[in-house]
Amino acid sequence: NRKNEILDELNNIGLNSQLHTSRKKLSKDTDIYIVDTYGDTKNFYSLSKLTFLGGSLIPHGGQNPLESAREGNYILYGPHIDNFKEVYKMLEKFKITTKINSIKNMKSVVRQKINFLQRNTVNKKLKYLGDKILNKNLYEIKKFI
């Protein structure tokens, strides 16, 4: 089971992680909350400051980062983003996303970004940029419809 394997790997590198489907009460020392159900992720973007889009770990095209960006989340992603290369390129220009190359470098990146995001002004800036980016993309899409 891949989700339990990921959970074990994160716990092994010192990141206290929890699966959404475990239905356990979330504790303050949880570093990573894994939403492992289809269609529920969007319900959590407004509650978080940092999102890792796990669909980018497998070669199926990636996940759209715009919903997460619009809620002011800093976005971490894996190597497989073929369907959203241009979107990620744009987000990288705004410095609101980081590529995770391996599970081993995830711990340091997550800790670094959590410390960075403790500052409330950063989250407000990310939310503002996310709104701008999403609105710009919606405008571009409407031109073709």
Can you describe what each PLM-predicted range is?
Residues 1-145:
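Nucleotide-activated sugar donor-binding and catalytic core shared by glycosyltransferases
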